[in-house]
């Protein structure tokens, strides 16, 4: 219905703002991964987006069909975009990534604390330097885990 259509529209805006396609040769994988998480964080902490996310959680509690649809079109979709970038990087020999979907799930875990804080209404520190350092550190560890042995 109407709520699903609103979710679809907002999802399209979200993906346009957050997850641009990874272009091998043009984009450095590290920078791409860092920028995607920073875009996600900036989008997530906007009050109107945080409120909408809370509304989605409330609505999906009453509708398993809506929950599945939102998950398939939202979190799973963005994980697949990252999995695709990881697959390209693997094919180019930049990393070793035999399970790109699992790796994409692990990657998004980097900002899980921020997501939970937003969902629970806990203020998120807006110190971008600290966030940048944290995300860079985590992406470094993530990529180290995908080096050829």
Predicted regions and their residues:
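Short amphipathic alpha-helical segment with a characteristic S/N-K-E followed by hydrophobic residues
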Residues: 1-4, 13, 66, 70
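Hydrophobic alpha-helical connector segments
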Residues: 5, 10, 19-53, 100-107, ...
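A short secondary-structure junction motif
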Residues: 9-17, 47, 63, 81, ...
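Short glycine-enriched, charge-decorated loop/helix-capping segments at active-site entrances
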Residues: 20, 73, 123-126
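Amphipathic alpha-helical packing segments from all-alpha helical-bundle domains
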Residues: 42, 46-47, 51, 55-57, ...
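Hydrophobic/aromatic-rich alpha-helical bundle segments in the mid-to-C-terminal region
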Residues: 68, 90-140, 146
